[in-house]
Amino acid sequence: LVFGFGPTWQGSHPSLGTKNALFPLDNLYFELIAVNDDGPLAETVNEHLEKNGESVFGLALETDDIEMAKKELSASFNTDLEISDGKGVNNISNEERHWRNIFIPRKFSRGIFTLLIQHTKGNLPKHEISDESSISRMDHVVINSNDPDGLVDLYKEKYGIRLALDQFVEKWGGRMLFFRTNHTTIEAIGIKKDGSPEDSLW
């Protein structure tokens, strides 16, 4: 077990063609996702696996007001984003969780699978820490970018995540960016290069 404990939630998303296992940490939860059937998300997962193998798939950013997020981001992206309703059933306990989410089109998320989510009903069960060596929190996730200015515009200005550090590192000729949310750092390594703006999770 990578975290020192098992998942507290194992379920499926019939309308999306995927299944998942959730591992709650102090500041977020880590989700393992796999193909379970045919569906729109299953197709995206398969494409990711073919290109990148088993690796970090995407980011889920939580909001307290999905309607306001839709309004503001639709205006920022000059498009009409859609809100979808979701439901999950825990195969371990039969508990249900409900949520509403927005899948951000990749042309706006700059290549990274990103969704905004508002949980509306049900809770993710916590785990009992039986060993002090168990993982308790996620410190940071890393993004590589060829367009740091555009990345700042997306994460700070559009998503509203605090930019805590913006520093040029001469050693490798690029910028180190720290975005902070919920005691978690989204770290970005930005080296300006020609070509279309593109980010990737590392």
Language-model features, listed with the residues they occupy:
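Membrane-anchoring hydrophobic segments
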Residues: 14-15
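Glyoxalase I/VOC metalloenzyme domain signal
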Residues: 1-7, 18, 25-165, 171-175, ...
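Conserved NAD(P)H cofactor-binding loop of Rossmann-fold oxidoreductase domains
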Residues: 11
